UniProtKB/Swiss-Prot annotation:
Keywords: Membrane, Photosynthesis, Photosystem II, Reaction center, Thylakoid, Transmembrane, Transmembrane helix. NCBIfam families: PRK00753.1 (NF001972). One of its GO terms (biological process) is photosynthesis. Belongs to the PsbL family. This is Photosystem II reaction center protein L. The chain crosses the membrane at residues 18-38. It comes from Synechococcus sp. (strain CC9311). The lineage of its organism: Bacteria, Bacillati, Cyanobacteriota, Cyanophyceae, Synechococcales.
Length: 39
């Protein structure tokens, strides 16, 4: 593990994880709403 990580590497990783989290949340909420409306 590097003691001094690349400053340009951290925000990209954080952005990618937040993007995947947002997609997952949108996907789960979409499934919940679709089950709500079609039930």
């Amino acid at each position: 593990m590097e003691r001094n990580p690349n400053p340009n590497n951290l925000p990209v990783e954080l952005n990618r994880t937040s993007l995947y989290l947002g997609l997952l949340i949108v996907f789960t909420t979409g499934i919940l709403f679709s089950s709500y409306f079609f039930n």
